[in-house]
């Protein structure tokens, strides 16, 4: 949670909100931030945290107040950062029986079910001091923000395991998701293509890398030299675009350097980005400067598949399969010492897409 991080001067157009996964999720936020978020000017009922559109939240806290109405309960929930009112609708009564039981056995069964339901209601009754989890949409009623629950339940947490887990989870989610401004990669890419001259050098390199990837995939290129990419007209035209060089914090200079050395350098950096993602790789430590496209190297696919297939027959791998690091170690021994984790991950994903292997659990794979 960062001070002022919920403020965003410019709203993302509502048509692009669906590109942000936070919009469709139940956002796990501190209650303080739920109370401080500003409502969208475009769509009432949607709130913004650091540019992220939020309409549903997930809170966990202690009940500090209970009010009962005919149709709902109103719980005051405190998570130690703030207190918010949660409207939790009562469950419909489905106990009524339309016709009298025709036998004593049916009467006995009905009585037992009624007693069971009463026991469940008693055990799950929420009182002051209980821990409650609420998931629902944010509403404003009489200028007070509240949550209208779609799901709520009492949390049985005598040794605070669940609450401690939430306390450890939230800072990580904030750091990795909520405190990162919402950016639409599709929109940024479209803007970059329409005006590539407005990019700085790292952004232009990243865009060139993406366009090179598309070229390699569309043409099913198996291997290439850097010089061959430099001869592709569309890629060369993009690399020739002027870039922005920031001379100081308040001064921006436009500079165009189209020397062959500069062109060679930007292509080299673009290919390096592809290598870091495991999309291309080199054999024999790159002595021949030849790059291989991971997706098209069927021989590498077969060898990795064979390693998994053979090792999964061994007793210690039959149940869970082979771990990623085990496959990597075997591949480096039998295929190539310099095989990177990124390349192996790409191969495993391709094999899994083709149903040659399956992931039994996180980082474990097996073959049939």
Curated annotation (Swiss-Prot):
Where do the record's region annotations for Interaction with CTC1 lie? Answer: 1-185
Q: Which GO terms describe its molecular function?
A: single-stranded DNA binding; single-stranded telomeric DNA binding; telomeric DNA binding
Q: GO terms for biological process?
A: negative regulation of telomere maintenance via telomerase; positive regulation of DNA replication; telomere capping; telomere maintenance; telomere maintenance via telomere lengthening
Per the record, which residues fall in region Winged helix-turn-helix (wHTH) 1?
191-295
Note the superkingdom of the native organism: Eukaryota
The name on file for this protein is CST complex subunit STN1
Alphabetically list the UniProt keywords.
Answer: Chromosome, Disease variant, DNA-binding, Nucleus, Telomere
- The record's principal subcellular location, in a coarse class, is nucleus
The residues that make up the annotated DNA-binding region are 57-155
